Amino acid sequence: AAIGIGLDISQPIGNIIVDIGGGTTEIAVISLNGVVTKETIRIAGDEMDECILQWFRNEHKLEIGLGMSESIKKSVGSAMQMNSKEISVRGRDLVTGIPKTIEVSSDEIRQALKDPVNAIVEAVKRCLEQTPPELAADILERGIIVAGGGSLLKGIDQIIRERTNVPVNVAEDPLLSVVRGTGMVLENLKKYEAVLL
């Protein structure tokens, strides 16, 4: 992902990237073609979808599918307090078995996402705590770069910034950074061979 967003990882400069994918969130401090510290957790976009699904089961006794859960996350999901929006959600009533539609607020969805968002922020903090001081100074100046589909969750950059006191930037094309980086490595195997070892 770091290569795909254009970071020159060969320099003696500390960069930190947070890749919030579907199944995992990977955080790495990179310098001189190597990973200095890293943290991987199995909490990412899929877990967020599951938390929304469980929220509807527990709070509203409504069965929704994972596709609906992901759609809700994309449309009104957020990591922080935002302008509240109401949305209609269709599902199957767990008590009667009959289809029904309910109105929910984006604030409820934020509550449903609280645990996975907190887990991601805590993993970022752990990675920062393990970073050598000379690279920490670079990171404080350059900021944290967030990539992957999970970086599109509204407010995820703001909450990481607030809780770490480090600037945060979302990658320009966060969904394609890993694919683009893989392509660049394959086109320049000699240049990136140290990264592959």
Where do the model's predicted regions map?
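A short acidic Gly-Thr/Ser loop motif
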Residues: 10, 17-24, 30-34, 44-46, ...
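Phosphate/ATP-binding catalytic cores across multiple sugar-kinase/actin-like superfamilies
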Residues: 8, 112-139, 185-189
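Glycine-rich phosphate-binding loops at beta-strand->alpha-helix junctions
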Residues: 77, 81, 136-160
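Phosphate-binding glycine-rich/basic clefts of nucleotide- and phosphate-handling proteins
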Residues: 31-114, 139
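Conserved phosphate-binding catalytic cores of ATP/NTP-utilizing and phosphoryl-transfer enzymes
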Residues: 1-18, 183-187, 191
